[in-house]
């Protein structure tokens, strides 16, 4: 690795930020990122920024620049040849498609202020797949905005000698703000007072593979959930997900309609506090009554919204966060439990109290949608 010579040869688990000799490039921004958001096409097409003009007196080329702070890092392997930057005013950030490896060790660590030369770059503001302003090389058959080649990017991406602490530029927001995060798109965010969902906690970051490249697990504040996207190539992909509660930091991106946080390294998670049970058993007010007969059709319950509180029963999301809930199909009401879109395993119990000294027969109807195994079990629990 190019960074090996930057660290002490003795064994030490604390790593310093790489030190670089720096010559100030003496550049000044000429354009605002917000203005380029407005001018960039959103219909899937790409614009090539105009070539530089020439000073009529000196004949020197006149270039246009934007300035921003680096907020992504490929140190953890979760960003691959894609860098994110946040304008110095903290507004919506942008993505640069660039053929670079180990950028964090090449003077592009988070907090570094850089200049991006715009002339002859392609740019767009797609509203599907990866969302937000993106810059790169002109279109190819494979990409609408291609990667800037390795030998070319130093002409466009120019580091300054200025670097700030992440704490000076991070947006400390709530989970709800992240989910409606148009103002924070492609910026560095930190969300406190959250924990990984029951399905994710204790598993690995790569436990819920959504495709051959990425996994999606979720954090929650007890009311809402937010996607945490991890590449299978991240060096922490197989590490255990924390089971506590605390904060998480990363780049807030959007894929189609889904806002998601992409961590830079495992250090972006700090959850030392005790975990909260956000899905306790829902105990019905009459659940201690043991009738001699039970005839339940679920027709008396609400399906819009779907009811999970049953006065005569106990509904317990024992593993994961999914309860039994009331659904309707073809004017027929029933209860359903599914792990779909939960990000992990679920196990929910519906406790039905009944006096079996007078009742000696039990029957019910079932229907399995998207069958993938024998997942329904019936247990007798004796209570005295």
Per-segment meaning from a language model:
Residues 103-105, 235-239, 337-339, 349-354:
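Beta-strand-rich interaction surfaces with strong enrichment in secreted/lumenal proteins
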Residues 6-9:
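C-terminal motif of bacterial Sec signal peptides marking the signal peptidase cleavage site
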Residues 63-64, 343-347, 354-363, 373:
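Extended extracellular/luminal ectodomain segments enriched in beta-structured repeat modules
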Residues 297-336:
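Extracellular glycan-recognition surfaces and repeat-rich motifs
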Residues 11-80, 84-286:
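OB-fold nucleic-acid-binding modules
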Residues 86-88, 379-384:
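Predominantly extracellular/luminal cell-surface or secreted proteins
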Residues 80-82, 216, 361, 373-377:
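Exposed beta-strand and adjacent loop surfaces of beta-rich binding modules
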């Amino acid at each position: 690795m190019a960074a090996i010579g930057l660290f002490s040869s003795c064994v030490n688990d604390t790593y310093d930020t790489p030190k670089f000799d720096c010559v100030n490039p003496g550049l000044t921004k000429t354009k605002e990122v917000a203005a380029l958001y407005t001018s960039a096409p959103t219909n899937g097409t790409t614009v090539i920024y105009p070539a530089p003009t020439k000073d009529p007196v000196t004949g020197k080329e006149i270039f246009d620049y934007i300035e921003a702070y680096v907020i992504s890092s490929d140190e953890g392997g979760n960003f691959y040849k894609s860098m994110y930057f946040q304008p110095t005013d903290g507004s919506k950030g942008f993505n640069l498609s660039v053929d670079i490896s180990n950028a964090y060790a090449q003077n592009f660590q988070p907090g570094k202020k850089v200049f991006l030369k715009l002339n002859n770059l392609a740019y767009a503001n797609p509203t599907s797949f990866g969302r937000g302003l993106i810059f790169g090389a002109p279109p190819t058959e494979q990409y609408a905005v291609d990667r800037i080649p390795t030998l070319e990017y130093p002409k466009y991406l120019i580091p300054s000698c200025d670097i700030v602490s992440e704490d000076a530029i991070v947006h400390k927001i709530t989970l709800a703000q992240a989910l409606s995060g148009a103002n924070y798109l492609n910026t560095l965010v930190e969300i406190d007072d959250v924990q990984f969902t029951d399905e994710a906690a204790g598993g690995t970051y790569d436990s819920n593979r959504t495709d051959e490249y990425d996994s999606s697990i979720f954090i929650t504040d007890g009311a809402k959930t937010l996607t945490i996207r991890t590449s299978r190539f991240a060096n922490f992909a197989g590490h255990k997900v924390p089971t506590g509660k605390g904060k998480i930091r990363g780049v807030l991106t959007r894929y189609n309609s889904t806002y998601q946080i992409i961590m830079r390294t495992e250090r972006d998670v700090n959850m030392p506090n005790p975990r909260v049970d956000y899905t306790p058993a829902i105990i019905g007010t009459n659940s201690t009554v043991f009738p001699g007969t039970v005839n339940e059709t679920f027709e008396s319950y609400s399906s819009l919204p779907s009811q999970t509180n049953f006065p005569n029963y106990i509904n317990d999301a024992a593993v994961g966060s999914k309860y039994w809930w009331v659904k309707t199909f073809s004017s027929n009401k029933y209860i359903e439990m599914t792990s779909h879109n939960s990000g992990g395993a679920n196990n929910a119990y519906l406790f039905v109290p009944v006096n079996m000294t007078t009742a000696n027969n039990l029957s019910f109807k079932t229907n399995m949608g998207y069958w993938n195994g024998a997942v329904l079990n019936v247990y007798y629990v004796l209570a005295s």
